[in-house]
Amino acid sequence: MKNTALRVSLATAVLIPLLVYAQPRPGNPTTATVITKAEIDKISATEQNQTTRDENARVVDIGDGWSMELGIVHRSKQHVLTVGQAAQAARGSGTAQAARGGNAQAAAQTTPCGEQMANPPADALQGAITHDNQTEGYYIVSGGGTAFIDGKVVNGRRSTNNPDGGPNGPGCGGGVAVGSRKVELNVGDVLIVPPGVIHGWFDIPDHVDYLSFRPSHGVMKNGWVNPTIASK
């Protein structure tokens, strides 16, 4: 009996702090959120006739200044050029600056980000992007392709675009990726990209549709709902 009482006392001593810690802190949400397959399909259907479309379904308050978004993304067939390929295509057309990752007018109007380099390597990839305050977790649901990840942004331009529903918030883009690696992503694969890490699509033979699970800190408007699924 004494041993039983001791075990109960020890269990209580362990569990009570855990239960107290598990309680939502004041001001944090106390309810869960459901996003149905029907809602996801409804948003996805509006994207299928576009080259690239990325929309969040909802911005959900998850407490302590964090929000969680579910991105629904469609990309049709595409192939990204290297700096060398773009320069060859642009030779003689007066668009060499764009081949290096940007153009003079845009560079003059925006704040540079990433490393600035007059002549990036020929194998650098166009379309590099990073997000300042958002992690992305891709889950491929249809199609697939070759993504590029990691490395550094060269000749980027800072984006402060931050509409209520995202999709991503401020970041660095418009430049080229140096030192990235390519990865194949197909149905069922998952890619997790922390804030500040380069990601993009190098080659999509037909299309790719994916869900992006996006915890963000301090950049989205909690409670925002995509107009396509918002209650009228």
Which residue ranges define each predicted feature?
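Double-stranded beta-helix
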Residues: P24-E47, R100, N119, R158-G169, ...
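Structural motif
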Residues: G188-D189, V197
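Short beta-strand His + acidic residue motifs that chelate non-heme Fe in jelly-roll/DSBH
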Residues: A147-F148, V193, H199-I204
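Short, conserved beta-strand element in jelly-roll/cupin
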Residues: H131-G151, N162-G173
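Bacterial N-terminal signal peptides
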Residues: S9-V20
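A short, N-terminal "cap"/entry segment at the start of jelly-roll beta-barrel domains
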Residues: Y21-A128, G223-K232
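Bacterial N-terminal signal peptides that target proteins for export
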Residues: M1-L10
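His/acidic/aromatic-lined binding-pocket segments of jelly-roll/cupin-type domains
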Residues: G127-T130, E136-Y139, K182-V183, V190-L191
